[in-house]
Amino acid sequence: MNPALSAVSDACERGKVVNAAWRRYGAINSLALAALIAGWAGSRTGEADRKRLSPREQGLRSARDAAVAAVAVTGVAAGIQGVRFSGMEPEGAVPLENGSEPDAGASPDESRAKRRLNLLGALHLASALTLAGVNAALREAGPGPGTGSRRRRFSRR
């Protein structure tokens, strides 16, 4: 979105455009977060008893639980902070230099709020990437047909 915002000459108009786009994206992001949590809860109830898992699998399962929690907490926190930030000016017209940086005309409170929002967004991305990595490791470590490394599956033949 940042390259397209360079065509908007007024800093307050850039804020309106960015906040309007994020409001629409927020609904989709909320649905995605709900689906992630529902999928995690469903898979968690259907998993093997902890006693039947290897120590590595137990550790990965705990890491996945922590990563899902981090994705949920940072996602909700970013959503709340985004709504607060957008509400600092009528129609979300907080002066922005681009999609990520406050304009010089932004108040100190607005600048701090934007920096917090950027930090929460980065933490949310990092937690989502961590979750993807843990899920990949679990897929490799998991027992049963269709799981484990290819090398291990093919060496059985």
Regions found by a protein language model. Give the residues of each.
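Short amphipathic, positively biased membrane-proximal segments
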Residues: 1-157
